[in-house]
């Protein structure tokens, strides 16, 4: 089995989301804030959550070496939310995104996790153009994106989604992105 990178911050572990996280993902995907701001994914059982992880997370992880990370609090190993780098259909470039269970919002976890994922995306995965999308009424997400250094660019629509979304962008200097670390895809190591 290929081993993918995990990350760590002062309070958090960021581990690639796997089928072991299916029960947690079921809860997150059906939380009121996920439904309101991201949308109903029609995942209603642990089995459907495992299938969602296989098709949306594992497939991208195998293809690119990064995807969705389950955010775990170090002190008690509780799963708080997710943060990741996504290759979304209809969006050129890599999208940084995050979602937390309502009881773990407004505690700085999303910013802490997203700063580390942003750093890893730039320094370890060589991402030179990072984007983010959010709905117009998700002001908390917009503020967090601005704290990450992303700037509002324009309104966009994604395929199969009639809602206009706010697009935020961050262009990374190519030299800075590759100067500190060169990422080697796990499958290229023999």
Predicted regions span which residues?
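Hydrophobic residues in alpha-helical segments
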Residues: 29, 38, 60-62
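Polar/charged alpha-helical tracts
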Residues: 55, 59, 159-160
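Conserved GNAT-fold acetyl-CoA-binding loop/helix
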Residues: 35-55
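A short helix-loop-beta-strand connector motif used in the catalytic cores of GNAT acetyltransferases and
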Residues: 57-70
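Acyl-donor (CoA/ACP) binding surface of acyl/acetyltransferases
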Residues: 1-36, 68-190
């Amino acid at each position: 089995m290929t081993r993918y990178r995990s990350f760590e911050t002062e309070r958090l572990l960021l581990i690639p989301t796997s089928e072991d996280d299916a029960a947690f993902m079921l809860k997150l995907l059906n939380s009121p804030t996920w439904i309101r701001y991201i949308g109903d994914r029609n995942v209603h059982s642990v089995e459907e959550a495992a299938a969602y992880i296989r098709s949306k997370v594992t497939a991208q992880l195998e293809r690119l070496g990064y995807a969705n990370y389950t955010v775990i609090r170090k002190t008690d190993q509780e799963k708080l939310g997710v943060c990741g780098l996504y290759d979304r259909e209809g969006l050129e470039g890599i999208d940084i995104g995050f979602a937390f269970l309502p009881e773990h919002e407004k505690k700085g976890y999303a910013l802490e996790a997203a700063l580390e994922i942003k750093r890893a995306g730039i320094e370890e995965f060589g991402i030179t153009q990072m984007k983010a999308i959010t709905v117009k009424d998700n002001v908390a997400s917009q503020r967090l994106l601005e704290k990450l250094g992303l700037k509002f660019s324009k309104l966009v629509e994604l395929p199969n989604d009639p809602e206009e979304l706010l697009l935020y962008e961050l262009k990374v200097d190519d030299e800075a992105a590759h100067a500190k670390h060169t990422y080697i895809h796990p499958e290229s190591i023999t």
